């Protein structure tokens, strides 16, 4: 199938992938008076007395804003907010289909951090959570940081944290399969953008000690010239031996490669220099850092990509719907590391020890168990970590 042509045709037919459907019928005078004036004044007064009643008297309890500025849309780059709308609508469809969450796309016409933060913060009272999408690095880090400080609802940049949650889930099962522990392995990553940095931070919270991040200029280490503040922060806690050189230099002896960068950056020759039973996450889309066949021919034991036509797809749809479902169910004030880790373990648990093999370390995107298992784990973690409000 020519997905580009067929998708364009469908979008012309759909004229948008979302619509509003009322929950209150207004088919007679009495019903109208209850849903709108004069009856609607009473719930307004209740919310005026206690703003948290907005969760009980409106749809806020189940509604998430999906926010972008259109600067890093899929592999298309900076295409603008309006051009990003089809992706945001699609994300909203996934929220509903896979999490039962109502989501509203908000495409902001500004690249200014303060503009975006102020816009979202002023609208936060209309939503139960905020999902930041396709905002370029390093601005995405500052936008998320400021919004988390200003908003008392979950703010979650899926390009960072959704990818990190799925990667951790897959890694937990891959390490189990090859008999290694996260605290003992050497991991080398390619790509120092939003996803790459979030992955490293989450893995380090799980006990990872030996990790080297690389970018276009090679290994990142403390003191390297030209690092932006975000890379300086990660350099201070990674690459403890201050290894220098290219990806090919530092990947020697590594147990795990995690790529969120560009097509073809990892070669079979590089894989052959890695440790026995190497694990490869080649998540660049649509063309991975290395294709599974080449990686396995070079000695890799487990290979995961971001593509649906290969086994072990790293697909964020396994994470964000259930994470928000769980956070909304307990009216969490934030989505913290404890909740992310709980989601990773929940996803990993859906692959039983009997089923676990080199081509099956992650459940399928359409596995009907995912939402409920992830939501329950996230809600419980929110309660235990003190961010649940009901």
Task: Mark where each language-model region is.
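N-terminal ligand-binding/catalytic initiation module
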Residues: 1-155, 375, 381, 385-389
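Short, ordered loop/turn segments at secondary-structure junctions
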Residues: 69-71, 79, 108-109, 134-137, ...
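General beta-strand structural signal in soluble alpha/beta enzymes
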Residues: 105, 131-134, 155-158, 189, ...
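Adenosine-phosphate binding glycine-rich loop
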Residues: 158, 282-390
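Rossmann-like adenosine-cofactor binding region
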Residues: 232-301, 307-309
């Amino acid at each position: 199938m020519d997905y580009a042509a067929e998708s364009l045709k469908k979008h012309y037919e759909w004229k948008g992938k979302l619509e509003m459907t009322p929950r209150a019928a207004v088919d007679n005078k009495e019903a109208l008076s209850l849903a709108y004036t004069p009856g609607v004044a009473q719930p307004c007064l209740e919310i005026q007395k206690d703003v948290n009643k907005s969760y009980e008297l409106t749809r806020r309890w189940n509604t998430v804003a999906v926010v972008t500025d259109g600067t890093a849309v899929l592999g298309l780059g900076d295409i603008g907010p309006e051009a990003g709308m089809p992706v945001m609508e699609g994300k909203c469809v996934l929220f509903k289909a896979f999490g039962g969450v109502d989501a509203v796309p908000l495409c902001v016409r500004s690249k200014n951090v303060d503009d975006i933060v102020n816009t979202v913060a002023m609208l936060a009272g209309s939503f139960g959570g905020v999902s930041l999408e396709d905002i370029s690095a390093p601005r995405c880090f500052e936008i998320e940081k400021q919004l988390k400080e200003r908003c008392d609802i979950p703010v979650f940049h899926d390009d960072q944290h959704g990818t990190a949650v799925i990667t951790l889930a897959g890694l937990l099962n891959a390490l189990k399969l090859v008999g290694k522990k996260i605290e003992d392995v050497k991991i080398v990553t390619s790509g120092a953008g939003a996803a790459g940095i979030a992955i490293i931070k989450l893995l380090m919270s799980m006990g990872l000690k030996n990790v080297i991040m690389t970018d276009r200029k090679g290994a990142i280490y403390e003191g390297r010239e030209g690092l932006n503040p975000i890379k300086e922060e990660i350099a201070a806690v990674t690459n403890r031996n201050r290894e220098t050189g290219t990806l090919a230099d530092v990947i020697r002896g590594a147990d795990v490669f995690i790529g969120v960068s560009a097509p073809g950056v990892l070669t079979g020759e590089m894989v052959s220099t890695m440790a026995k039973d190497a694990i490869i996450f080649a998540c660049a889309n649509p063309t991975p850092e290395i294709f599974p066949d080449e990686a396995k021919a070079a000695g890799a034991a487990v290979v995961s990509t971001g593509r649906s036509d290969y086994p072990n797809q790293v697909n964020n749809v396994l994470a964000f719907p259930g994470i928000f479902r769980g956070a909304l169910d307990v009216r969490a004030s934030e989505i913290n590391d404890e909740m992310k880790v709980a989601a990773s373990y929940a996803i990993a648990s859906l692959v039983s020890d009997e089923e676990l093999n080199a081509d099956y370390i992650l459940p399928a995107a359409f596995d009907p168990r995912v939402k409920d298992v992830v939501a329950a784990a996230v809600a419980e973690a929110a309660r235990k970590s003190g961010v649940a409000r009901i």
